């Protein structure tokens, strides 16, 4: 039996057990409270915030693109999209009809859209209608009680100052598709998001990571139905959660001169083709136009299927940049290369002559000259000036195709020149190895005769053609063409600058340079030249015309008038050269598709670019040209007073001849073209 002491001890043990249990329970409760409120307090607080806060992305405005003289070529315009966030869209039966009425959509189209995205996370917004009007924005914002879960997202759309005049050069932006997101994230190591816009061509694509900026975000306080109540400032939030300011993209200053660009664009009105002007002394692209074009702004405001279908089904391929992505037979503009190769290799000299009777026979096969009655006795100078085919057929029998390949590639043809723009093509300069690998056939001599006049397999881009003539003008210095001068911040700080880069340099014989340059001068400026129709008062060019066959004609059709042919079978017209003719500054290349003749079709476009350039940068030189219009090429060479003034828009020390013919050395220009230091001798 238990005694009284035993009974007391039992009660004490029970009390201690109960107390220990109570203490343990409190300890567990306190531990749990510590775990929830201290250890994971931040996490659970953030969960609670998600119920009353909405994180809105603040899109970073894209950087601006300027011309070389700081003319704004692109700008940003706000665009508004109506979106539904399913997490807060709790009254669809009531809201959808009202929303459809405001947005002028059918209720069924909204329901189908929501059904399409019902598998994605409910907090992700769904765009119901892009680019809504300001009236629609006002209704959705002021009557938000009627539209729970519906909000307005602001985007920045892109507009282009000159429309399609620079469409291929500047490019366009459009929304990244869901399929491309993973690939782009991997390629660029950048956290692209659904709804992001990205450059898809031209400068917009090539420099997208510079231009795009960095998005921020802003927290909004919302009610239980997802309606925005107020912006939340950083001081309102728990430690570790903060608003982020969007950082605008960097700005781009191009090498393009807008006036020369527009001159080329308007000169190509009603024509399909390409035009380019390059600074001979740096490789900077002054103008770059491809037609037909497209409206780049439409891509950033929500491209309609009809417009996209029109673009991709158009047989003229308006999306293709003909300057760098298309290649053409250069025709007679290539004869200059053949002449240089023959002179440099000693195959001919300045005294070599050919009697042109209008055709040349290789075995039993006739090769016709463009001039049916022939040119008579022709030397290398006249062969360029008057574009005699028979002269070059004769050279073709003496020249190995690999020699032609050597010089063409030396001048940058048949290869990518490395311009920093997407999808540059190589063109084609054939040789024996190429034909054997491609066709498993030996090279034939008759093929060389076609190649030396820029036909058959020979294909070049307008960019390569301009670079070739720039290299002639600089007497052997091939620059890498580029379209961007610098990248700079909104404060004006230059972050990157692009300097001239010489791909390679070589020296030509003086006799070669003298013959070729005089012939190119006389093509435009003296009677008998194939481009004398483009001689302009105060606008002095040197260059070469070309006609590129689209298809071969039979012997009885070869001399038929080109304009009488069906349009798609007409020859392309080309002009390539440089300006001014003496002490040149820019090289020019123009292709007019199915233009028939280089002089009448392409020549006026080149002349328009040369005129815009000389009028703007060398007004004094233009006056001298007008005064000295009767001078011959040798007289101009000897008259140093005709050396052009330096480009007034650039900085740097230069040497030039003043109006009195005195050599001025180390003339320093600032942006306002004021002399800082000058001396003469």
Where are these regions (language model features)?
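Beta-lactam-recognizing serine transpeptidase/beta-lactamase-like catalytic domain environment
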Residues: 2-6, 12, 74, 118, ...
